[in-house]
């Protein structure tokens, strides 16, 4: 069966140990399994505070989490590299220009010494064995991961899989030249793979997901180089195709965490702005008042301006996809759900299952914002509706069957 566009299975709120400050059971987020999403819909989710890891999408709950995570982006047209960032590029350039030491003069027939060559290529996300081997070396050397933990399945799930449903032929009038979706950018020096950038190319800009590099090239600061090259990618597209890329103007860096030094550096790419989760406004991260609020841990409201209207789907009009034993049965609205279930012979008895699901659907509508108006929430009749009739506990089985129909 073809993948279902704009469909998720909302899981709800999740509490886990924090990966930034290591506090136990202190990181809180809302999550969903994304079976299929257009890049436009995912872009709307990003602007509402969501992010993805493979096909898992999540939104940190800033008001109750230990480390407040704010979506951060840069307007590429306004970006100017700092002195330190220019030094990073000069260091790379000096390395590339330096004569290669290959045990010989390395020259051509005329005796000239050849410089190194850096090539950056962008291709749609797919599993590449060479990338996987580089990722394992990076994770072991930089993050201290055990070799036994570095599985191909984890690499695929985290860095290759995506929920995007896109036409691979770019729209010449309204998209970047390479198209939209999930991509890997390979960095090669003289043909050797030295780094990989995992990015999403969305209607409004490039979203940087992950970057890994060869530990032998640590002195080149390739992580900083990649951010500058990704910004340059957006700028180049805007220069070459101004009409097609009028909205393609931002560089998204994921989340900014003011209290975490390894995440705070993102504000160095200036001028950058943070999303205020209360007012739905974007505020300059270097604004004095914003900095005071961040220093005082007043994370919920970064802007003193009035809140912008936030569109949300009316729960009874929201879309619900019904699955039964791994097959999509029907698509309906929450308001029409009870009648549809009766029409296909599903006896809900007290209907407690539908009422409980209705509460979860209302929560999804509120937390997904505008994007949720056109995203279907896929639910399994037996595991998620009928299960509620016999138990007060939420069924926590995997979403493998739902993933199979999407």
Report residues per predicted region:
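A eukaryotic "domain-start" boundary segment
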Residues: 1-46, 51, 59, 63, ...
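Generic alpha-helical structural element
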Residues: 7, 30-34, 120, 124, ...
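Acyl-donor binding region in acyl/amide transferases
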Residues: 25-44, 52-53, 179-182, 190-273
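Extracellular/mature segments of secreted proteins
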Residues: 25-31, 73-76, 308-324
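Residues that form generic nucleotide/phosphate-binding pockets
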Residues: 44, 48, 137-141, 158-161, ...
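A conserved beta-strand-loop-helix scaffold within acyl/acetyltransferase catalytic domains
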Residues: 53-56, 60-64, 72-219, 318-398, ...
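Active-site/acyl-donor-binding loops of N-acyltransferases
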Residues: 72-74, 242-307
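A general structural signal for short secondary-structure boundary/capping elements
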Residues: 166-169, 233, 297-304
């Amino acid at each position: 069966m073809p993948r279902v566009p704009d469909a998720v299975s909302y899981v709800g709120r999740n509490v886990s140990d924090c990966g930034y400050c290591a506090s136990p059971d202190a990181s809180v987020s809302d999550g969903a399994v994304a079976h299929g999403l257009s890049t436009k819909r995912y872009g709307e989710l990003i602007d509402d505070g969501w992010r993805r890891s493979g096909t898992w999408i999540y939104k940190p709950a800033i008001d109750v989490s230990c480390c407040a995570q704010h979506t951060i982006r840069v307007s590429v047209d306004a970006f100017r590299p700092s002195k330190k960032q220019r030094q990073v590029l000069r260091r790379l350039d000096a390395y590339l220009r330096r004569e290669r030491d290959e045990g010989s003069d390395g020259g051509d027939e005329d005796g000239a010494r050849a410089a190194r060559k850096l090539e950056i290529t962008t291709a749609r996300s797919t599993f590449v064995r060479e990338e996987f081997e580089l990722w394992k070396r990076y994770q072991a050397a930089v993050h201290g991961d055990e070799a036994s933990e570095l599985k191909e399945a984890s690499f695929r799930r985290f860095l290759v899989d995506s929920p995007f449903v896109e036409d691979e032929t770019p729209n010449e009038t309204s998209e970047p030249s390479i198209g939209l979706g999930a991509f890997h950018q390979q960095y090669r020096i003289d043909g050797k793979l030295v780094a990989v950038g995992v990015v999403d190319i969305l209607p409004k800009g490039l979203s940087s997901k992950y970057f890994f590099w060869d530990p032998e090239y640590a002195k080149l600061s390739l992580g900083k180089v990649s951010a500058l090259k990704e910004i340059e990618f957006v700028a180049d597209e805007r220069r070459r195709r101004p009409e097609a890329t009028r909205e393609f103007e931002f560089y998204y860096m994921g989340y900014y965490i003011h209290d975490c030094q390894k995440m705070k550096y993102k504000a160095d790419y200036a001028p950058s702005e943070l999303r205020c989760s209360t007012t739905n406004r974007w505020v300059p991260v270097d604004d004095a008042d914003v900095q005071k609020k961040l220093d005082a841990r007043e994370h919920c409201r970064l802007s003193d301006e009035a809140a912008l209207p936030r569109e949300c789907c009316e729960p009874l009009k929201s879309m619900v996809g019904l699955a039964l034993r791994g097959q999509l049965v029907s698509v309906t609205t929450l308001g029409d759900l009870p009648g549809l279930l009766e029409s296909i012979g599903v006896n809900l008895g007290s209907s407690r299952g539908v009422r409980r699901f209705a509460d979860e659907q209302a929560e999804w509508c509120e937390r997904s914002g505008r994007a949720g108006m056109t995203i279907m929430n896929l639910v399994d009749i037996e595991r998620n509706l009928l299960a509620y009739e016999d138990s007060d506990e939420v069924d926590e089985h995997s979403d493998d069957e739902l993933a199979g129909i999407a």
